Amino acid sequence: MKLLKFGGTSLANAKKFLCVADIIEKKNKKEQIAVVLSAPAKITNYLATIIENKIDDEVLKKINLAKNIFIELIQDIKRIQPLFPYENTKSTIEIEFNKLKKIINGILLIKQCPEGIKPIIISRGEILSVDIMKNILQSRNHEVTILNPVTNLLSIGNYLDSTIDIKESKKRIKKINIDQKNIILMAGFIAGNKEGELVVLGRNGSDYSAAILASCLNAKCCEIWTDVDGVLTADPRIVSNTYLLDYISYQEAMELSYFGAKVLHPRTIEPISQFQIPCVIKNTNNTESKGTWIGKENNPSDNSLKGVTYLDNIIMFNISGSCLKDSGNTIARIFTILSRESMKIILIIQSSSENQINFCTFEKDIDYILLILKKEFTLEIKEGLLNDFNIVKNLTILSVIGSNISEKNNIASKIFSSLGSSKINVLAIAHGSSKHSISIVIKKENLLQGIQNIHNTLFFKKTIINVFLIGIGGVGKALLKQILKQEKFLDQKNIKIQFRMIANSKKLLFLKNSINLNNWEENFKKSKEKFNLTILNELLKNTCDSNSVIIDCTSDYILSKQYISFIKKGFHIITSNKKANTDSLKYYSEIRTTALKENKKFLYETNVGAGLPVINTLQSLFSTGDCLISFKGILSGSLSFIFGKLEEGVLLSEATKEAKKLGFTEPNPFDDLSGIDVARKLLVLAREIGYSIELKDISIEPILPERFKKYQNSEEFLFKLKELDSFFSERVNKARDIGNVLRFIGSIEKNGKCSVKIEEINSNNPLYKVKNGENALTFYTNYYQPIPLVLRGYGAGNDVTASGVFSDLLRIIL
């Protein structure tokens, strides 16, 4: 005997009803099957609103609407399965809803709904589900036995939330003579009290019914069919990289359920655990999925964690005062009164040294708990033995579940570390009270980030980097291509780079999980989300996981002024944008102070030398105590190319035009030839070395006369540049005559004096052969003399710059 239970989502429409019938048929070929059915999706909730709201004439309209849902359902079944007895089923539906209408008319007369009538109203969906399934199976030539839960399941409790007496119910069902060839059907959610009245079993009542019937029939297995593949390691609506659990123990399932996982209600687990009946969670939308097996305790060698879950809308009561220490029965009185009033206490945290106790409960109970506690301890409060009750609202309890979790090394420390990385404070912790769970209390606003951090730390073997990319010009696109190309390599290194946002100055593409880099451009074009700083900051507010990074591949000054704000939100910053590092010394220092305080990285390797390891090399060098004697460098790839062409006899205007065509220059080459870009890079280096200077402190010897500033149009600028061709040719020839070349060089002296100018250098200089877009940097230091440290390579181009950004990205996790 095997028991199958199908929830409301599995019976949501005609196709799903018939799919359930197919599953029942297939299972019945191997062994006898008992089936427990819920009402079709949303029907029970719909009927519940009838008894929860004011009973008036509008209720009859709602009854008709509910009836029509069932009529449409069986009409669709008839179209798909022609032998289905539509007229007989329709007649049953009409009879049931006519009963409801008579009940409602009676309620309208007495102007109230008796408690005993409420379960009759809200249980119609389950009863009709059984009748519809009976008719489907009989039309397929199957014999069916229907068990009446009112007469066979004895309940204890109130009309709307009863508990089953398993022992008595077992006796009753044992007396029934059921043909072993018959398929057994029973409505879930329903039972009968000792007076024979219909009652319902409260939340998850159908699952509970299934567990009870499985126990009563001595079923060898209880299958709970729903709309998910089984038990996952976390809520997939919140955490993107969850995975299916093959097996969990009864106790683990109980803990998961108790702390909020939508697996099974604890009441459902109790009977299957008591009678050692295995339970399988299966998916009617994916019948091939193996599901999750719930059974006896795990093998002691099983060290795997099983899930992270949460309870929302929690409050924490803080009760303090001298009587907690001096009077031993005060704490007992607190929990006796709460137990007597059926108030659920989720966590208890006691601190005897501070004469206080904290307990967590649901927010909905706050007013009543406050009322009964004040009434109970009126005298103690009046005498000052108890302080006013302090209540902390808007909390969440996160719980990590796993067998013998309290004995596992480093689990608690990993939890705290993952939360600490995002500045999430832990208000309370329960560790050791249950050997299968660790629970922490945090603010509700940190739920999303907290559960993602913990899950990624404990359950995902790969190190995840969440990227928010702003700027998809040449460098941004090259970066995306490089990361896509390296996916296999990164996978081998257990690194997963997830792009959560891709944006330009006009719009953005954002996904809660991860953007597929194979078709990001197509999806970006489809996106209708606008981009501005207000929208960006709102989006970032609730999306920061551990290892979340903002990459700025723009040259936008306003965006660079947001870096401190981004860091405070929990993001690392990687930027090829030089604006922040060349802003005021005050802002430059504030970024670093904030990054240090928030334990975040601010990386900008490509600010100087594109993909060359300049910044990282300098930081490593000077952190070991080395000191600069002097520096000279060619810091512009575009000017390296142009001056190299001048050396070959190419005219200035033609060399500049060729550099622009190859993508070495800014849109208007004046920006390159002005020398300001080289000055900014020199400023970054000087500050990195330790000099507290501003951009205005750098002496720039202009390449061009002042009058060229007015030519903002690139074509006009290049045309006018011809006026300087002969001057530069003469200057180049003069240098060549004595064996020298011209180079545009940035210099830093030991006293911090910085300059940018054209210099004439000979063949002994390390910069002599640097051209064709190369950068070269020569550092004379205490450690590197008389031969300098030289860094040389291409310092311009999208690919090398993107490579530098990519390198910074991997440094986030190193």
UniProtKB/Swiss-Prot annotation:
Binding-site residues, Na(+): E605, V608, A610, L612
Pathway: Amino-acid biosynthesis; L-lysine biosynthesis via DAP pathway; (S)-tetrahydrodipicolinate from L-aspartate: step 1/4; Amino-acid biosynthesis; L-methionine biosynthesis via de novo pathway; L-homoserine from L-aspartate: step 1/3; Amino-acid biosynthesis; L-methionine biosynthesis via de novo pathway; L-homoserine from L-aspartate: step 3/3; Amino-acid biosynthesis; L-threonine biosynthesis; L-threonine from L-aspartate: step 1/5
Cofactor binding description: A sodium ion is seen in the structure; a metal ion may subtly affect the relative position of the nucleotide-binding region to influence enzyme activity, and could increase the stability of the enzyme.
Obligatory cofactor(s): a metal cation
Binding site for NADPH: V475, T554, S555, S576, K578, G797
Reactions accelerated catalytically: L-homoserine + NADP(+) = L-aspartate 4-semialdehyde + NADPH + H(+); L-homoserine + NAD(+) = L-aspartate 4-semialdehyde + NADH + H(+); L-aspartate + ATP = 4-phospho-L-aspartate + ADP
GO BP annotations listed: homoserine biosynthetic process; lysine biosynthetic process via diaminopimelate; methionine biosynthetic process; threonine biosynthetic process
Pfam families reported for this sequence: AA_kinase, ACT_9, Homoserine_dh, NAD_binding_3
Gene behind the chain: thrA
Molecular function as annotated in GO: aspartate kinase activity; ATP binding; homoserine dehydrogenase activity; metal ion binding; NAD+ binding; NADP binding
Protein role: Bifunctional aspartate kinase and homoserine dehydrogenase that catalyzes the first and the third steps toward the synthesis of lysine, methionine and threonine from aspartate.
Keywords for this protein: Amino-acid biosynthesis, ATP-binding, Kinase, Lysine biosynthesis, Metal-binding, Methionine biosynthesis, Multifunctional enzyme, NAD, NADP, Nucleotide-binding, Oxidoreductase, Sodium, Threonine biosynthesis, Transferase
Active-site residues, record numbering mapped to chain: K681 (proton donor)
Family per record: In the N-terminal section; belongs to the aspartokinase family. In the C-terminal section; belongs to the homoserine dehydrogenase family.
Binding site for L-homoserine: E666, D677
Binding residues for NADP(+): V475, K506, T554, S576, K578, G663, E666, G797
Subunit structure: Homotetramer.
Protein name: Bifunctional aspartokinase/homoserine dehydrogenase
